């Protein structure tokens, strides 16, 4: 069963039986190293995670808040699918350039991050193939995420970690000795 088919079953349960179901598609929030680090052209794990706050990451605190708001709003919503991610600094007008020259768009949209990245010797991605937009979740769930790329850049400028307070408290929950941490996950064959 796929995630999409599971979501469809939730929608059927709402339609057929009136069960309130709110589906949250949660962006990356884990502190573990990326499973495909070779794709990032020598960027550090912190650089990768910080960049992702613009397009495909959410702070653990914000993910928790989204779940609490969804549980509270479910009876009024009935059914809904929502993307839970940091608020992107990009607009629809940026999408074409993000495919070919993302670094320029980052520098234009988030100048604080551009300055902090330069100080750290970090780089923005050359191109982005996706940008998660959380506007429906913010509107319908009355959700106000606190951590976006500007907030992360401000934390870094103050000498704080790219990892938010809750993610530091929770830490890594990696599976010890799994092949997942050495590349793309591939189940062992008998």
What residue spans do the PLM features occupy?
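A short C-terminal helix-loop "cap" of Rossmann-like NAD(P)-dependent dehydrogenase/epimerase domains
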Residues: 16, 29-51, 103-118
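Active-site Tyr-X1-5-Lys
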Residues: 1-21
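Alpha-helical substrate-binding/gating segment
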Residues: 32, 37-48, 52-83, 87-89
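Residues in well-ordered alpha-helical elements
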Residues: 61-64, 135, 146, 150
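Mid/C-terminal beta-alpha module of Rossmann-like enzyme folds, strongest
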Residues: 64-129, 134, 139-140, 163-168, ...
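Short linear loop/turn motifs
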Residues: 121-126, 148-159
